[in-house]
């Protein structure tokens, strides 16, 4: 398994706690009021450095004196001095505070019921755990934002953590929105479809599902069971005859009156009931209808009901464990090992298991399982509606406050609990087993990846083990829809949230000039990097957040999909922006007949390298190259499909209006024409064997 998200690069090296720090007084605190609830759209909280237990914090009158740090004072003294200045201006009301370093990178975001007392606890000269002491030693400034309530502070804290990604907070990674199933209600013939993002379209939403694959499989089975349409409204309105889905019994054909309004409405109601958890009643109804049709010797109708029942059984067989007493809940379980944490999340809705996903949050090794889990759950519901019940494997701090915040967000009561017995405890135990197994696989993959990177450095003679590898490739068909792409890999595997595609823009580019395309891609990528550092980002640029559009991070190794010619084009591109020999380049040429295992490696000013076909380093390089190829081909096909949709069939030589009409009448949609084989195309009236081949090649041309 290659884990998608990657841990952001480490911040600048920390100064030792007993050495001098940079000069300069720390600015005073910023006590701006919060902008209002409309700006607090997150529903979570992160770890507080300490408890809000007032017995642990100094009284207000005992706040530290804000004496300026003496010249040559150590980092701890400078940090405490900066915090003491902030304490003098900090409010005694709820709020959120941010610790900043000399480069104004946010080190930590926290919230407190009494901000003044919380900040005063950091300024104590003794009693800090190592993690907090390290943070204080790097702090030169503190910013404070006041809020009306502690709940509002909790929500704002989580929002800022997700935006700023401070290194001393627990950070949720791979926070991709979850897919839902939507049955629309804004058309007389409702549509079923997969949905991500804001739930703004009228209809019933069912989810979340753990993956898009789970949603797609469920929708396909639901179409077989309930014959609900999945086409767009515009396609629906343009039909004069049923499409292919009607022919294969995955749609009832409401577009052309194959089913009347009451009949289709009943199908939609049954689908809604099934997704709402009333699956037993729906199956009993279908079984009764099947028996009735069979008794009346309507065997074709009985077979249809039989197939619908089989489709429902297929859905439930994919869901695995389905609870008997839990209607709606999310289950969180954490396991820690080797300084890593894994949180496994299971989703149960309408009494059905809708999947699970493993997360690997970034956290300091000193965090306990309860601390990591509390911060994770808090951030998890930033852009997701919470269920009525949240089951946890560990007790977390401020569970009641978090439940209140989620209640405000969701508009219904939210309960957070650690079950002690019964089926709920079994669900948590099952999730914890999955977390332990997922972390075991993660650790094994990480160790393997580390060894591969070390061996790669040895094989290529690199000065150090690469921590960031960028791989470049481009794709086109005779110069059309030309696109370049960059993929990124590191110790944690592929870093997919840093992949980038580059639509080729150069005017006057010779169609199919791969070298010129590569030059353009590399110049655009590295000009951004040079510009970001020239603007004064310095080390901050190297530590930029992975979701930054420009991805201003220096690679340790750049791999080019191509031989000596592509490598020289890459060197020329970098030389043109003053980066001659500042970036390590590697060209990977395919073997004879494109045989895997016979690749040749090229480094600048060195002889070509040929590795044994079974060499793990060669296999690793192949995997990197193939991932870049997969990504760029996908990007190219997306552009090509967009052009095909806009142009339709008119672009195919020899296909005029008559043949176009015949194809659409036979297949129903452009998508079905694209899927058809040459033999299927040849069955259409007026389409010769030569025309069928031409149509097939138009849709299936292989990009370069």
Curated annotation (Swiss-Prot):
Swiss-Prot/TrEMBL GO biological process terms: nucleotide-excision repair; SOS response
Domain GIY-YIG: 92-170
Keyword set, alphabetical order: Cytoplasm, DNA damage, DNA excision, DNA repair, Excision nuclease, SOS response
Region feature (Disordered): 1-77
Comp. bias (Low complexity): 67-77
SMART domains: GIYc, HhH1
Localisation per UniProt entry: Cytoplasm
GO cellular component, one term: cytoplasm
Principal subcellular localisation of the protein: cytoplasm
GO MF assignments: DNA binding; excinuclease ABC activity
Pfam family, one: UVR
Residue ranges constituting the UVR domain according to the UniProt record: 280-315
Keyword DNA repair among record annotations: yes
Compositional bias per record (Acidic residues), positions renumbered to this chain: 49-66
UniProt record similarity statement: Belongs to the UvrC family.
Function comment: The UvrABC repair system catalyzes the recognition and processing of DNA lesions. UvrC both incises the 5' and 3' sides of the lesion. The N-terminal half is responsible for the 3' incision and the C-terminal half is responsible for the 5' incision.
Subunit relationships: Interacts with UvrB in an incision complex.
Protein name as it appears in the record: UvrABC system protein C
Organism: Rhodopseudomonas palustris (strain ATCC BAA-98 / CGA009)
Chain's gene name: uvrC
């Amino acid at each position: 398994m290659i884990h998608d998200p990657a841990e952001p690069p480490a911040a600048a090296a920390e100064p030792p706690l007993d050495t001098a720090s940079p000069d300069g007084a720390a600015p005073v605190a910023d006590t701006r009021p919060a902008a209002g609830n409309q700006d607090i759209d997150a529903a979570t909280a992160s770890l507080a450095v300490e408890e809000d237990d007032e017995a642990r914090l100094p009284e207000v009158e005992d706040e530290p004196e804000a004496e300026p740090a003496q010249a040559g004072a150590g980092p701890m003294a400078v940090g405490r001095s900066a915090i003491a200045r902030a304490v003098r201006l900090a409010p005694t009301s709820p709020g959120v505070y941010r610790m900043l370093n000399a480069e104004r990178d946010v080190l930590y975001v926290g919230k407190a019921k009494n901000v003044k007392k919380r900040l005063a606890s950091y300024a104590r000269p003794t009693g800090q755990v190592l993690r907090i002491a390290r943070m204080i030693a790097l702090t030169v400034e503190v910013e404070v934002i006041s809020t009306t309530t502690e709940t509002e502070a909790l929500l704002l804290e989580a929002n800022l953590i997700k935006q700023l990604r401070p290194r001393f907070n627990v950070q949720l990674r791979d926070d991709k929105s979850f897919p839902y199933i939507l049955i629309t209600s804004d058309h007389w013939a409702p549509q079923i479809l997969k949905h991500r993002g804001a739930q703004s379209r009228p209809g019933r939403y069912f989810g979340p599902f753990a993956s898009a694959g789970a949603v797609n499989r469920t929708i396909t089975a639901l179409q077989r069971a309930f014959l609900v349409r999945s086409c767009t409204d515009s396609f629906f309105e343009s039909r004069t005859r049923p499409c292919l889905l009607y022919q294969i019994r995955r749609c009832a054909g409401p577009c052309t009156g194959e089913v009347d309004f009451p009949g289709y409405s009943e199908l939609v109601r049954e689908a809604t009931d099934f997704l709402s958890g009333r699956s037993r009643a729906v199956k009993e109804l279908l079984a009764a209808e099947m028996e009735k049709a069979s008794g009346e010797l309507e065997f074709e109708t009985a077979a249809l009901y039989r197939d619908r029942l089989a489709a429902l059984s297929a859905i439930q067989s994919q869901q695995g464990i389905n609870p008997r007493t839990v209607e709606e809940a999310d289950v969180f379980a954490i396991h820690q090992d080797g300084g890593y944490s894994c949180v496994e999340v299971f989703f149960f809705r309408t009494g059905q298991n809708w999947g699970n996903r493993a997360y690997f949050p970034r956290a300091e090794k000193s965090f306990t399982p309860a601390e990591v889990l509390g911060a994770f759950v808090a951030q998890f519901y930033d852009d997701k509606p919470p269920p009525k019940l949240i089951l946890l494997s560990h007790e977390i701090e401020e569970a009641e406050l978090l439940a209140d915040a989620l209640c405000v967000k969701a508009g219904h009561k939210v309960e957070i609990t650690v079950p002690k017995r019964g089926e709920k405890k079994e669900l948590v135990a099952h999730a914890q087993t999955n977390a332990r197994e997922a972390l075991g696989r993660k650790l094994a993959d990480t160790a393997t990846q580390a060894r591969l990177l070390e061996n790669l450095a040895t094989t290529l003679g690199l000065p150090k083990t690469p921590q960031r590898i960028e791989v470049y490739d481009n794709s086109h068909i005779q110069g059309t829809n030309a696109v370049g792409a960059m993929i990124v890999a590191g110790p944690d595997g592929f870093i997919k949230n840093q992949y980038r595609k580059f639509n080729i823009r150069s005017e006057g580019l010779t169609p199919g000039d791969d070298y010129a395309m590569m030059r353009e891609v590399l110049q655009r990528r590295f000009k951004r990097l040079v510009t970001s550092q020239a603007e004064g980002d310095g080390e901050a640029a190297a530590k930029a957040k992975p979701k930054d559009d420009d991805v201003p991070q220096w690679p340790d190794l750049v791999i080019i999909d191509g031989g000596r010619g592509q490598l020289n084009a890459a060197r020329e591109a970098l030389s043109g922006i003053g980066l001659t020999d500042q970036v390590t380049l590697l060209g990977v040429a395919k073997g004879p007949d494109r045989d895997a295992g016979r690749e040749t490696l090229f480094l600048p000013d060195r002889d070509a390298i040929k590795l044994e076909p079974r060499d793990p380093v060669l296999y690793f390089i192949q995997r990197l190259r193939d991932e870049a190829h997969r990504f760029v081909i996908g990007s190219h096909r997306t552009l090509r499909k967009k052009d095909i949709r806009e142009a339709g069939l008119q672009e195919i030589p020899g296909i005029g209006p008559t043949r176009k009409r015949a194809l659409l009448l036979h297949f129903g949609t452009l998508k079905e024409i694209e899927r058809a084989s040459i033999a299927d195309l040849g069955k259409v009236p007026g389409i010769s064997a030569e025309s069928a081949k031409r149509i097939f090649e138009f849709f299936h041309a292989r990009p370069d």
